[in-house]
């Protein structure tokens, strides 16, 4: 059994989603958004760090999966996103979590089937895959999709490792 916290970083809204993986079975544990309403960036980063740290303390995940930085059209936006990612990663590393990074297009392709999926499609598939009664908020759905992607690739790695080390495998 593995508990994964997925993080969709943002300087104004950081989504998080927590799922438990037991073999191929995924269980939804929680999700939400850390919203920073202040204007100065250092305070926003402090709030993101504190929020992610609190979530980790509450749910005790085994690892963190986070979205990789993509190059935004606006360099200032890319820098702010990188800073938000950085404090989220530090929150995980400070609590001894291994951190795994996934590109947004890979997450969309894994969860929806196409790397060009929109937010509504991601929300719909996350709701379906986790058997939720309602769609999560967009940023929380993205974070859950990142965690689901980690489960998918983690399961693939486990199967590959079993084939390589199992002397009974043909």
Swiss-Prot record:
<keyword id="KW-0378">Hydrolase</keyword>
<dbReference type="GO" id="GO:0003677">
    <property type="term" value="F:DNA binding"/>
</dbReference>
<dbReference type="InterPro" id="IPR012337">
    <property type="entry name" value="RNaseH-like_sf"/>
</dbReference>
<dbReference type="GO" id="GO:0005737">
    <property type="term" value="C:cytoplasm"/>
</dbReference>
<protein>
    <recommendedName>
        <fullName>Crossover junction endodeoxyribonuclease RuvC</fullName>
        <ecNumber>3.1.21.10</ecNumber>
    </recommendedName>
</protein>
<keyword id="KW-0233">DNA recombination</keyword>
<dbReference type="GO" id="GO:0008821">
    <property type="term" value="F:crossover junction DNA endonuclease activity"/>
</dbReference>
<feature type="binding site">
    <location>
        <position position="67"/>
    </location>
    <ligand>
        <name>Mg(2+) 2</name>
    </ligand>
</feature>
<dbReference type="GO" id="GO:0000287">
    <property type="term" value="F:magnesium ion binding"/>
</dbReference>
<keyword id="KW-0540">Nuclease</keyword>
<comment type="function">
    <text>The RuvA-RuvB-RuvC complex processes Holliday junction (HJ) DNA during genetic recombination and DNA repair. Endonuclease that resolves HJ intermediates. Cleaves cruciform DNA by making single-stranded nicks across the HJ at symmetrical positions within the homologous arms, yielding a 5'-phosphate and a 3'-hydroxyl group; requires a central core of homology in the junction. The consensus cleavage sequence is 5'-(A/T)TT(C/G)-3'. Cleavage occurs on the 3'-side of the TT dinucleotide at the point of strand exchange.</text>
</comment>
<keyword id="KW-0963">Cytoplasm</keyword>
<feature type="binding site">
    <location>
        <position position="8"/>
    </location>
    <ligand>
        <name>Mg(2+) 1</name>
    </ligand>
</feature>
<keyword id="KW-0238">DNA-binding</keyword>
<dbReference type="GO" id="GO:0006310">
    <property type="term" value="P:DNA recombination"/>
</dbReference>
<dbReference type="Pfam" id="PF02075">
    <property type="entry name" value="RuvC"/>
</dbReference>
<dbReference type="GO" id="GO:0048476">
    <property type="term" value="C:Holliday junction resolvase complex"/>
</dbReference>
<keyword id="KW-0255">Endonuclease</keyword>
<comment type="similarity">
    <text>Belongs to the RuvC family.</text>
</comment>
<keyword id="KW-0479">Metal-binding</keyword>
<feature type="active site">
    <location>
        <position position="67"/>
    </location>
</feature>
<keyword id="KW-0227">DNA damage</keyword>
<dbReference type="InterPro" id="IPR002176">
    <property type="entry name" value="X-over_junc_endoDNase_RuvC"/>
</dbReference>
<feature type="active site">
    <location>
        <position position="139"/>
    </location>
</feature>
<comment type="subunit">
    <text>Homodimer which binds Holliday junction (HJ) DNA. The HJ becomes 2-fold symmetrical on binding to RuvC with unstacked arms; it has a different conformation from HJ DNA in complex with RuvA. In the full resolvosome a probable DNA-RuvA(4)-RuvB(12)-RuvC(2) complex forms which resolves the HJ.</text>
</comment>
<dbReference type="GO" id="GO:0006281">
    <property type="term" value="P:DNA repair"/>
</dbReference>
<keyword id="KW-0460">Magnesium</keyword>
<feature type="binding site">
    <location>
        <position position="139"/>
    </location>
    <ligand>
        <name>Mg(2+) 1</name>
    </ligand>
</feature>
<feature type="active site">
    <location>
        <position position="8"/>
    </location>
</feature>
<dbReference type="InterPro" id="IPR036397">
    <property type="entry name" value="RNaseH_sf"/>
</dbReference>
<keyword id="KW-0234">DNA repair</keyword>
<dbReference type="InterPro" id="IPR020563">
    <property type="entry name" value="X-over_junc_endoDNase_Mg_BS"/>
</dbReference>
């Amino acid at each position: 059994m593995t508990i994964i916290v997925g993080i969709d970083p943002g300087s104004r809204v950081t989504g998080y989603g927590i799922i438990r993986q037991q073999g191929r079975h995924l269980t939804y544990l929680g999700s939400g958004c850390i919203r920073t309403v202040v204007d100065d960036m250092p305070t926003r980063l402090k709030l993101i760090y504190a929020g992610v740290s609190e979530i980790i303390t509450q749910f005790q995940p085994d690892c963190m999966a986070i979205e990789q930085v993509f190059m935004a059209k606006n360099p200032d936006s890319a820098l702010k996103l990188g800073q938000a990612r950085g404090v989220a990663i530090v929150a995980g590393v400070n609590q001894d979590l291994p951190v795994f990074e996934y590109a947004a297009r890979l997450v969309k392709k894994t969860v929806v089937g196409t790397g060009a999926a929109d937010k509504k499609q991601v929300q719909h598939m996350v709701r379906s895959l986790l058997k939720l009664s309602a769609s999560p908020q967009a940023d929380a759905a993205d974070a859950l999709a990142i965690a689901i992607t980690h489960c998918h690739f983690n399961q693939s790695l486990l199967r590959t490792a079993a084939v390589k080390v199992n002397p009974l495998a043909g």
